[in-house]
Amino acid sequence: MSNQQIKEKIISLNNYLKHLNHLYYDLDAPEVDDKTYDSLYNELLELEAKYPSLVLEDSVTKIIGAFVSNKFKKTKHNKEMLSLDKAYKESEIFSFYENFTQYKNLENFGFSLEPKIDGLSISIHYDNGKFIKAITRGDGTTGEDVSENVFQIRDVPKQISYLKPLEVRGEIYMKKSTWKSLNEDIKNQYFQTNIEKIFSYMQALPKSKSWSNLKIKTPIFFKNARNAAAGTLRQKDPKIVKSRNLSSLFYEIVSPLEHNLKTQMEVLAFLKEQNFEVNEFQKLAKNDQEIMFEINEFSKIKNNFEFDCDGFVIKFNLIDKWEQIGFTSKFPKWAIAYKYMLEEANTKILNIVAQVGRTGNITYIAQFMPVELNNTTVQNATLHNYEFIKKNNINIGDEITIIKSGEIIPKVISIYKKNTDSVFEKVLNCPSCNSLLEIPEGYVDQFCRNENCDEKKIQMLTFFVSKNCLNITNLSVQNIRIFYNHPVIQMREIQDIFLLKNHVDEIKKIKFFAGKSQENKKINNILQSIEKAKDAYLRNVLAALGIKGIGNIAANLLTNKITKLSDLNNLTDEDLLSIDTFGEKSIENLKEFLSSEKNQDLIKFLDENLNYLNSKKSSKLNNLNFAITGSLSISRDEFKKIILDNGGIFSNSVSKNTSYLISNSKENSTKIKKALENNIKVITEEEFHNLLKEENA
């Protein structure tokens, strides 16, 4: 893949993971199972590690957890509730273990092992032996006070014998049998309610003369036990919480050394002594071989438990070393969660279709007999490009093995049973416009080169209004398709988006928008979003044009040399080559874009109709290029804003163009080593602020 394609992949994964986070943490309505999420997250991590210059500032890999709901009182945690780093392979467990071999007599205290419960993290406070309050994890720093609801859970102790102030942490979950009973109750209630409704309606039928007015809602079942637990814990009525029989398991005490608890195994024993529910399957392993043995042993029985379990938690047992071992911004370094392999399924291909994207690239999709993967029904999977189909000898009618992996839709990983004698025939023409497809030099993907291809243009418009570009929030791809295909509106070009206000009468006649005041509100929301988007940062507008190789980072660097889009025409090769990440290919792509009369018309239109916001507050750091490594006193996004606001250039990686590398750490990270090798000055956060003061003087 080209850099631009990789960048688009990273943006796509990041946006989708944000969407999943919102559903999972804030709405209690997960769209995918945890294994699918973990695989998506893992693919993003791998891409970021491989292409550090393409890491997004708002990457979900930098965020601890959920946003805080507004349903319950926000409460700050006394100590952050961090998540755990994850391992997927045996080799990653061995690497984790290597970090501790420096300690003498390691086998004497070893590692505690516990199953990873798929529930909702909770922190409960006790004082003088009494239950005081319960707080959800939230974003790791601030959670929700759900004390009244947690108090209804039967196995959560309301009184303990330990009298000192104590904070314990664990998981609230719903047993599998309880979840099944709850869904059965929902079904029975549904039938009972609607039988009565139908009976009453039948009695009135001679008057109504029609069944068309009888409206019966479809019952809403909980897809899995975690959904049921999440929906229950955030109920406004504590009586409902009590009736649904939630359960708990605890595994942590905050500041255990203050309670004279020296090992994690002692913590678990203390919790049990105080009548907290703890997992009975807890082990102590002396070394990496024993860790893997216990992980493999538990995998054989994990489905026999009443709780959902997707992993195994390994903690360095000796607590007084935890602070010394330390933390990242998201994880403790002394613990890790081993995640079990993703579930696979076999199914039969019913059809293979080709789809065209914004750049014209063709993706093949397999449509197959629906199968269940971790409580999710799937019936489509990506086949990537024709080379993948050819290499794996895939055709309609073959039986395949699929896995919910690092894609928004599942992946085909192999042929399970070959039922045909041939391979699927290569698509030669664009599925949208029927143009002959091409394979550019250096690529394996096929491309549609027709600039007027309808689907390409729809995808281009969708990209332009997306969050990382113009962020026109209410103009969905569904709306774009409607306006694009309308005989009068014909929203075919970017300029047409800003002329949509001239077609309000036509929009009101469209069935989707017609009649109701609610639908008129939809129209107003779209138009208001478009007007709001006219005040835009130049870097976002440039990125929204979709020029190959010029994503958000390159656009940000490029806009340091221009004040409007038309200034691009005046930049020399020398100007462009002085920009970090810009090479001959990027220059070629930019020149190709600017050579089009159609694109020049677009540039002129945007310059005349948009108000470019100036993000710079000063020029103190003009022509200085900064990179960052390690943790700082403020978030990386905030630090980046200071650099950009003062005219500096921010880059995710160290290169020959880097002026300073900012780091508070004395450790020799990869970035620090590269900076020193290239005679780039490494400065602390304090030295950076001193530099700002000097420039100001």
UniProtKB/Swiss-Prot annotation:
PROSITE patterns: BRCT (PS50172), DNA_LIGASE_N1 (PS01055). It catalyses: NAD(+) + (deoxyribonucleotide)n-3'-hydroxyl + 5'-phospho-(deoxyribonucleotide)m = (deoxyribonucleotide)n+m + AMP + beta-nicotinamide D-nucleotide. Pfam families: BRCT (PF00533), DNA_ligase_aden (PF01653), DNA_ligase_OB (PF03120), HHH_2 (PF12826), Nlig-Ia (PF22745). Residues 616-697 form the BRCT domain. NAD(+) binds at residues 34-38, 83-84, 114, 137, 171, 315, 339. Transmembrane segments: none annotated. Signal peptide: none annotated. Keywords: DNA damage, DNA repair, DNA replication, Ligase, Magnesium, Manganese, Metal-binding, NAD, Zinc. It comes from the Bacteria. Zn(2+) binds at residues 430, 433, 448, 453. GO terms for cellular component: cytosol. The active site is at residue 116. Its EC number is 6.5.1.2. GO terms for biological process: DNA repair; DNA replication. Its cofactor is Mg(2+); Mn(2+). GO terms for molecular function: DNA ligase (NAD+) activity; metal ion binding. The keyword DNA repair applies. InterPro entries: BRCT_dom, BRCT_dom_sf, DisA/LigA_HHH, DNA_ligase, DNA_ligase_AS, DNAligase_adenylation, DNAligase_N, NA-bd_OB-fold. Belongs to the NAD-dependent DNA ligase family. LigA subfamily. DNA ligase that catalyzes the formation of phosphodiester linkages between 5'-phosphoryl and 3'-hydroxyl groups in double-stranded DNA using NAD as a coenzyme and as the energy source for the reaction. It is essential for DNA replication and repair of damaged DNA. This is DNA ligase. It comes from Mycoplasmopsis synoviae (strain 53).
